[in-house]
């Protein structure tokens, strides 16, 4: 049975989608069967793996409101499978309020196909609302990207409070899968200090490999490619492959 991991941080700009996209590609490259569920209305993970949001047969919004099946919605790419999103998903937060088991719509959908994958990543929106609650109820665990910059720990207290609430009331299996340090700048003492502080807060959960600041990571999405393909020898690509190996050891 595959593991379902929600990639979540309510603070924007921390490398959440970049991490979801590139770990999907790196694990696929390593021979794992991976699905990336784009559950963010911005749909950047969808375009980041080369899909045109204008030409989708179905999308995850239609899945959670019951108008399409997961099997008919998944798109297959050379970088991994994608359950794509569009801006339509923004309306789901309202529509889900009127359906049965609103917090479990994504979980019910993913349970039907989880045996087909080694890992299912969910790219969550950068907020703590109904779409994110759906993601946390669907997941076995969470992966938290944390940028190595000032205010890095801002919002993590709220996220951990939400995690405890969801675990207690909605999804008792939910755990922390890992913490990924992103935007690390080895030229500054500050990045090192932030990394040390995060490791102190999450003992045993922070990946040894950190994701550096790297221009190729910023360029790759505009080409619809993961950095592991856009520039496979770049520091960003090497770092995500190394982090993927750490994940493989935990599977």
Model features per residue range: what roles?
Residues 1-251:
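P-loop NTP-binding core
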């Amino acid at each position: 049975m595959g593991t379902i991991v929600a990639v979540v941080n309510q603070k924007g700009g921390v490398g959440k989608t970049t991490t979801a996209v590139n770990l999907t590609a790196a694990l696929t490259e390593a021979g794992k069967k991976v699905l990336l569920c784009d559950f963010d209305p911005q749909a950047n993970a969808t375009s980041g793996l080369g899909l045109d949001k204008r030409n989708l047969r179905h999308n995850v919004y239609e899945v959670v409101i019951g108008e399409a099946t997961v099997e008919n919605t998944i798109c297959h790419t050379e970088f991994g499978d994608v359950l794509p999103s569009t801006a339509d998903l923004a309306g789901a937060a309202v529509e889900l309020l009127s359906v049965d088991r609103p917090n479990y719509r994504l979980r019910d959908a993913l349970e039907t196909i989880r045996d087909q994958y080694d890992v299912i990543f969910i790219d969550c929106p950068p907020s703590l609302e109904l779409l994110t609650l759906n993601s946390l109820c669907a997941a076995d665990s969470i992966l938290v990207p944390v940028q190595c910059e000032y205010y890095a720990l801002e919002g993590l207290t709220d996220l951990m409070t939400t995690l405890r609430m969801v675990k207690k009331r909605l999804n008792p299996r939910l755990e922390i899968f890992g913490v990924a340090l992103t935007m690390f700048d080895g030229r500054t003492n500050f990045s090192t200090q932030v990394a040390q502080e995060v490791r102190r807060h999450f003992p045993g959960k922070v990946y040894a490999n950190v994701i550096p600041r790297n221009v190729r990571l910023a360029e790759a999405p505009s080409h619809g490619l993961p950095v592991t393909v856009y520039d496979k020898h770049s520091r960003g690509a090497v770092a995500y492959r190394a982090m993927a190996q750490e994940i493989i050891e935990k599977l």
